[in-house]
Amino acid sequence: MKYIFYLLILFSTLSNSQKFDERVDNLIQENIEETIELRHWFHQNAELSNREFKTAERIAAELRKIGYNPKTGVAKTGVVAILNEGKEGPVVGLRADIDGLPVKERANIPWASKMTGIYNGEEVPVMHACGHDMHTAILLSTAKILYEIKDEIPGQVKFIFQPAEEGAPAGEDGGAELMVR
């Protein structure tokens, strides 16, 4: 997780001072437990493509708590927030996929998914089987950390929480293509 945050600042003209590095390291350490808690919540509450309603609500609520004004309903259930909106300079987009898969949870963990959803007309178990829960939690933590140092970022950062990355249900549009329309 630490390396994601360092990659984010490569685009900027920020000082590489030891003091700045220590500040970022401290912010990361301060947010690790919350990131894990968020990941567990998203894992327990996995939703299928274009049905990520609770997921989107939680993402938007977390972003508002930080200080963002997120746009919801993007590409049906996507969420977008912008750091330093309107600020001159480079613009960087960071994306996390938020949908789960029609897969039964087999792990015996306290945060196992017990969610179900309708897939091809049948009720099926749903879980995050390929890391979208982690992607979402890490991007939220990244948004929080960058918000803390926003005055030192010489441009904008767009946080994109994309629904339906695994593919929209039959007969529906969804995913990245809708996000950029």
Question: Could you say what each language-model-derived stretch is?
Answer:
Residues 1-4:
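Positively charged n-region of N-terminal signal peptides that target proteins for export
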Residues 10-14:
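N-terminal signal peptide c-region/cleavage motif recognized by signal peptidases
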Residues 19-128, 137-158:
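Acidic/His- and Gly-rich active-site-bordering loop/insert found
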Residues 153-181:
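Fold-level recognition of mixed alpha/beta catalytic cores in primary-metabolism enzymes, strongest
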